[in-house]
Amino acid sequence: TAEVMSXVTAXFGXALEEXXDEXG
């Protein structure tokens, strides 16, 4: 459902940002 995708996208986005911060 849209809600599931939204939650997954939000979690993935946060993790992606953290990875970028660690690498940066």
UniProtKB/Swiss-Prot annotation:
Keyword Membrane found: no
Keywords (A to Z) from UniProt: Olfaction, Sensory transduction, Transport
Tissue and organ expression note: Antenna.
Keyword Isomerase: no
Domain of life, source organism: Eukaryota
GO biological process annotation, one example: sensory perception of smell
Family listed: Belongs to the PBP/GOBP family.
UniProt function note: Present in the aqueous fluid surrounding olfactory sensory dendrites and are thought to aid in the capture and transport of hydrophobic odorants into and through this fluid.
Oligomeric form and interacting partners: Homodimer.
Name used for this protein in its record: General odorant-binding protein
Native organism: Antheraea polyphemus (Polyphemus moth)
Lineage per the UniProt record: Eukaryota, Metazoa, Ecdysozoa, Arthropoda, Hexapoda
